[in-house]
Structure formats: C-alpha cells, structure tokens
Amino acid sequence: MEDSGKTFESEEEETNYWRDLAMTYKQRAENTQEELREFQEGSREYEAELEAQLQQIETRNRDLLSENNRLRMELESVKEKFEMQHSEGYRQISALEDDLAQTKAIKDQLQKYIRELEQANDDLERAKRATIMSLEDFEQRLNQAIERNAFLESELDEKENLLESVQRLKDEARDLRQELAVQQKQDKPRTPMPGSGQAKRTDMAVQATGSVPSTPVAHRGPSSGLNTPGMFRRGLDSSTSGTPLTPAARISALNIVGDLLRKVGALESKLASCRNFMYDQSPSRTSGPASGRGTKNRDGVDRRPGSTSVGDKGSGKRLEFGKPASEPASPALPSAQGVVKLLL
C-alpha cells in the first residue's frame, strides 16, 4: 500500500526497486519453506520418539501389572501361613499357660509345707533375721532416696543458672538487634546494603532468639551450658570496647546467640520430658513395704538410732514433684532414676 504511492525518477529505478523487492520476498519465502521443512522433520522425529517411549511405557506397565499380581498372590499365601502359625502359637501358649498354672500350684503347696516345717523349728530366729534384713533394706532405700533428692536439687540449681543465662542471652540478643538496626541506619547512605544471604541469616538469627520455649530447662553438665554464655559475653565486651563491629560480625554474633538459644531450648524439652516421666511414675508408688516394716518395728524389735535421723533427713530433703511428703520410696524409683539419667 505504501509502495503504490511512491514516485520514481525513472523507469529503470522503478524496475530495480520492484526487482529487489521481489527478490526479498522470494528469499523470505524460501527461508520460510526451509524452516517449515525443518519443523516437519523435527516434528516427525519427535513423534517417532514419543511413540517409542509410549511403547516402552506400555511394556513397563504390563510388566508392573504382572509383578503386582504376583506379589498379591504371594501376599495371600503369606497371610494364610501367618494365620496358621498364629493359631498354632496360640494353642501352644494356652498349653504352656495351663502347665504354668499347675506348676505354680505345686510350688505353692511345697512352699507352704516348707514354711510350716521351718516355723515349727526356728520361728524366733527367722523373725529376728527377717526384721534385721527388712531394716537394712529400708535404710538402703532411704539412702537411695536421699541421694536421688540431692541429685534433683543439684539439677534445680543448674536449671536456675540456665534460666539466668537464657535471660542474659535474650537481653544481649535484643541489644545486638538494636545496635544492628542503628548501625544499618547510619551506614545506609554510605555503604551498600548486605547481600541477600546476610539478610537471610539475620532473619534466621532474630527468629531463633525470639522462639525460646518457656519450660524449665535441663542441663547436661556444669561445663557445657554455663561457661559458653560467659565466654560469649566477655567476647562481646572486648569487641565493643575497641573498634565498632561490622555488620557481618554482628550477624555472626546473632547467629551464635541463636544457636545457643536453640541448644537451651532442646535442654528445656528434655528436662520437661523427664519431669513428665517422674509425674507418670509417682502415682504407682505405694507405702506397702514401708508400712509392713514399721509394724514389725512396733511389734517388739528395737529400732536403730541411725534410722530415725536418716528418715528425718530424707523427709527434709524430699522435693515436691506431685508426691506427698510422707510417702516413702518404692522399688520402682531406682528404675525411674536410671531412665532420667539416660535421658539426661
């Protein structure tokens, strides 16, 4: 449309113009046809490849279906075998339980007969020996309870120290965040902002410092959780007394604070699980053995002078973990103490 209104100075110029234009369109047409041929060839190759892949996938699907059917049959056979073995095992267990009941009955009869014979021969000597053994066992249990209470008191002291360390770390983290914000505001017109990696680390450190749980904390040892905050604070004091810290150094300090707070949180959760375990164990403690021993002592056997002081000492040092103060230690307590030590 635009070429129709164009004027030429001579017919030769017009002829050359239209010839060049025709060559240009011809070249474009040839290029377009070449691209079309290449596209058709590529599409045919791609179609052939897709058909080959489809055949492979169909073959694999058939193989998987056959494998699935085989596995289903094997599962059914295994279920049948398991049911047969289960029924056979149940029958054997029933037979063994009957044998055990008969054996226990015979054992009870024999023990009763033996007790009657021994009671006729040495009743007084046996009573004295049983009383002495019960007193020794009671004193041993009192000593174990006192040791356990002392251990729990030391754990409470360490918990208080860790709470102070956590509060101090929170204050230091808040001060570091405020100083970092002020430093960034001051350095913003002069220096470029830190990269995305440093900003991400800063956000992670701030989130870590703000996500400390509020449950009571536990402590692995006297040197792992108490020395680290003090050393970290001394490092901060020495760094702030000299030249001001760079943003990268402050970010690394925040990362250290976040790691320490996460460790303290893990210790808190462990102590909470230990306390829950102790709460679960406390309702099962009964006063049967101790009351029986007390009856024997009142029936005519003199009590030892040291047993009264040990009992008073144990009742004075007993911690209130959801248990009455007058309840003695039971045989289940040593196992609970072992579980607590294992968790710690």
UniProtKB/Swiss-Prot annotation:
It comes from Mus musculus. Pfam families: NUDE_C (PF04880). This is Nuclear distribution protein nudE homolog 1. Residues 1-93 are annotated as: Self-association. Residues 167-290 are annotated as: Interaction with CENPF. Required for centrosome duplication and formation and function of the mitotic spindle. Essential for the development of the cerebral cortex. May regulate the production of neurons by controlling the orientation of the mitotic spindle during division of cortical neuronal progenitors of the proliferative ventricular zone of the brain. Orientation of the division plane perpendicular to the layers of the cortex gives rise to two proliferative neuronal progenitors whereas parallel orientation of the division plane yields one proliferative neuronal progenitor and a postmitotic neuron. The keyword Lipoprotein applies. It comes from the Eukaryota. Keywords: Cell cycle, Cell division, Centromere, Chromosome, Coiled coil, Cytoplasm, Cytoplasmic vesicle, Cytoskeleton, Developmental protein, Differentiation, Kinetochore, Lipoprotein, Membrane, Microtubule, Mitosis, Neurogenesis, Palmitate, Phosphoprotein. One of its GO terms (biological process) is establishment of mitotic spindle orientation. Residues 88-156 are annotated as: Interaction with PAFAH1B1. GO terms for molecular function: identical protein binding; microtubule binding; protein domain specific binding. Residues 181-246, 279-337 are annotated as: Disordered. Highly expressed in ovary. Also expressed in brain, heart, kidney, large intestine, liver, lung, small intestine and testis. GO terms for cellular component: centrosome; cleavage furrow; cytoplasmic vesicle membrane; kinetochore; microtubule; microtubule organizing center; spindle; spindle pole centrosome. The modification Phosphoserine is found at residues 211, 239, 282, 309. Residues 18-188 form a coiled coil. A lipid is attached at residue 274 (S-palmitoyl cysteine). Residues 324-336 have a biased composition (Low complexity). Gene3D superfamilies: 6.10.250.1080. The modification Phosphothreonine is found at residues 215, 228, 243, 246. Residues 279-289 have a biased composition (Polar residues). Homozygous loss of this protein results in microcephaly that preferentially affects the cerebral cortex. Affected animals have a smaller cortex with reduced superficial cortical layers, although cortical lamination is mostly preserved. The smaller cortex size seems to reflect both reduced progenitor cell division and altered specification of cell fates following progenitor cell division. Residues 296-305 have a biased composition (Basic and acidic residues). Belongs to the nudE family. Homodimer. Interacts with dynactin and PCM1. Interacts with CENPF, LIS1, CNTRL, dynein, tubulin gamma, PAFAH1B1, PCNT, SLMAP and TCP1. Interacts with ZNF365. Interacts with RAB9A; the interaction leads to RAB9A-dynein motor tethering. Interacts (via C-terminus) with MCRS1 (via C-terminus); phosphorylation of NDE1 inhibits the interaction.
